[in-house]
């Protein structure tokens, strides 16, 4: 077990990338050519529970999948930033919309497009298979 050197009681919002964070790193293709996503049921349970507990949740992704959008809407997430070319802009919009400070936001990303947000948020986290550049920034790392 690892220790996160951060006062978790300060966290009021969670923001996530999708591909590689809330879905597998491998995206199978449907015969039609459309990418198919897999999701973790436990992640979904945790997200809907966080929403019920009053945490603000944002999804900030470069992807544009309607299926993924429906999944998060079904979990109670209303702050969805799809097709995010420069994630820091959407992160700041989310933060400012709710009058949050960077220190009140946990962000989980796994790849280079997430790095700018991870440098700005209060608690940058990543999955264990994140790229090395992201691992150099993170404070908390998932063990799965």
Question: PLM features: residue spans?
Answer:
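Short hydrophobic/aromatic-enriched beta-strand-loop microsegments
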Residues: 77-85, 124-128
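Acidic, Mg2+-coordinating phosphoryl-transfer loop and its flanking beta/alpha structural elements
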Residues: 106-140
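Conserved Lys-Pro-Asp/Glu-containing loop-to-beta segment of HAD-superfamily phosphomonoesterases
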Residues: 88-115
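Short beta-strand/loop segments at the ligand-binding rim of alpha/beta enzyme cores
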Residues: 53-58, 97-105, 122-123
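Active-site neighborhood of HAD-like aspartate-dependent phosphohydrolases
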Residues: 1-56
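Conserved small/polar residues in nucleotide/adenosyl-binding loops
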Residues: 142-144
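Short beta->alpha linker loops
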Residues: 42, 63-64, 86, 110, ...
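Substrate-recognition element of Asp-dependent hydrolases with the DxDx(T/V) motif
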Residues: 47-71, 81-82, 118
